[in-house]
Amino acid sequence: MLHFNRCHHLKKITQKCFSSIHVKTDKHAQRFLSRTFALAELRKSWYSTHSLVGDKNIILMGPPGAGKTTVGRIIGQKLGCCVIDVDDDILEKTWNMSVSEKLQDVGNEQFLEEEGKAVLNFSASGSVISLTGSNPMHDASMWHLKKNGIIVYLDVPLLDLICRLKLMKTDRIVGQNSGTSMKDLLKFRRQYYKKWYDARVFCESGASPEEVADKVLNAIKRYQDVDSETFISTRHVWPEDCEQKVSAKFFSEAVIEGLASDGGLFVPAKEFPKLSCGEWKSLVGATYVERAQILLERCIHPADIPAARLGEMIETAYGENFACSKIAPVRHLSGNQFILELFHGPTGSFKDLSLQLMPHIFAHCIPPSCNYMILVATSGDTGSAVLNGFSRLNKNDKQRIAVVAFFPENGVSDFQKAQIIGSQRENGWAVGVESDFDFCQTAIKRIFNDSDFTGFLTVEYGTILSSANSINWGRLLPQVVYHASAYLDLVSQGFISFGSPVDVCIPTGNFGNILAAVYAKMMGIPIRKFICASNQNHVLTDFIKTGHYDLRERKLAQTFSPSIDILKSSNLERHLHLMANKDGQLMTELFNRLESQHHFQIEKALVEKLQQDFVADWCSEGECLAAINSTYNTSGYILDPHTAVAKVVADRVQDKTCPVIISSTAHYSKFAPAIMQALKIKEINETSSSQLYLLGSYNALPPLHEALLERTKQQEKMEYQVCAADMNVLKSHVEQLVQNQFI
């Protein structure tokens, strides 16, 4: 009786499922598919087709050998819904011949058309559909499927695919001609898979079909749950009678708004997503672009940016505008020290790694009915990187997004000033401020929080203000990628095995770069210590050592490393919020005290927690120049002053028991006078371009930055505005630029 009831129930499920599947062919107006629907075991599960995807189909896409058919059957069993294999249930039943026979009969091009036609005549609902490897190469049929389905891409490492296909004795697939290797064809097909998917399942080497099936279901749940990934302010307080959703923002809102209305910074309401060891290992052989796509997809919900669109943005951002194909390569310097070269972008600093991508993210997130004015404070590198990044938007986006970069008139190097000024375009301007970076940064925060002024701009000019500094989550997030990528490169180059710890040493001013490394660790990269390297403006070093953030009696010094000439470190608030278990009340108290009393002290328990992961020290001007000189003499490599600061600190505090990755945050050519002084080259009072040519004659590593050289030829005579260090003057400048751009 039990066996009968069980079989009877299976029969009813089968009939119910397949009653909604129809295939129309030239020979038959309509016919029902019949296929054995067998379950190894009936078990109760909260999964159901209705509760998970409703009437939509789960569509599994991927190359031959990805396991679509096997995984599809497992998912069908878990959900209690019908499973359709396009090869077996659609194509062969339509053609009355095997797929291989059809391919041999009509050839590659005609096969794709015939395959697409068969899929166009097919419809289903509430089913699991396993596509062929070539389905995504036919646009019309994929649009047809996408209308009523969630497409999940089974992304399997290339070497795994080739091994599987050999075991399956598959020696030819659609599109493979004589002289075309299986490896090349599989690489070629990736562009089609990336075009269509809604969710990606990254299938690490050795994953079982059951594990992949669970990943598919989790990916679909995430895709469906559009409210699951939100952001809160670091100063958000959680009252007992208030639900989380009251003040939570989505990713797109956090990017658009930049700064929270209470003065805090946006952070994820939940923990950072974490990759498994197997997933990380599968990324060892991946390119920078591929790594970025995997990591950022985990951090950005597809409801904010569809995965396929995000992939397009990443490919655009890290394309031909980077001088090195590896984007952010790692170079062995000496001993246990490695240099992470973050200066191969168009403006020669690490800011390019985020600011070539962030403008595309911002343009996607904003509503089409408003204009946006981006306000940026720069201590040197951010200004030119922001102006360059937003100038690369398409024409329509540039008409509704403009940028103003405020920089300390006498607080950046001559080359940096020329570069910022020379980066001005039709939608971007540079404004020198007769003060320091801290004033510029504080002024922008105050402008954002001036509701009368921002409201006036919105009503009068239809313009909303936002930020592209690292206070903006969309600016900070892409930086996580290069810290993870650096570790994977060390594994790829054979210096370490995955799981071995490393230290990172980062020249730090605003705390964004080193915070991105913290997030990389949260995602699964085994970073042991974060070494914070300061110059003479060592407020962060003092804080990490004592827990006392004290700006009293402290004046900003101008150094050879101007990008870290910062006293108020904005992103420190994000890290303290993380350490304090998201205590928004504490953050409000601490940073209000910093604003009013110019100092704060954290409790002993937090100091100890901070010091478990962080080590800090600082470098004098003389030590900085000496490090540039000695490194060049011993290795032929020229460090920029910021990297030299990190090198000095790493030499002093790192115990040499594991590798240390030193972030090289800028190309040395941006600081030619300091480099010439360090190398004891007689300084000639010539143009920046002449100084670069002189340094280039030394044939040092890294080579001369060609993009910087080209820009210096054009930018030294451009005009720009200078304003007094007065809030009302800055607001007047902003309003005038809004009028000029949008009215």
From Swiss-Prot:
Modified residues (N6-(pyridoxal phosphate)lysine): K351
Gene3D superfamilies associated with the record: 3.40.50.1100, P-loop containing nucleotide triphosphate hydrolases (3.40.50.300), Threonine synthase, N-terminal domain (3.90.1380.10)
This protein's UniProt keywords: Acetylation, Pyridoxal phosphate
Cofactor: pyridoxal 5'-phosphate
PANTHER family the UniProt entry points to: THREONINE SYNTHASE-LIKE 1 (PTHR43515:SF1)
Family (UniProt): Belongs to the threonine synthase family.
Protein name as it appears in the record: Threonine synthase-like 1
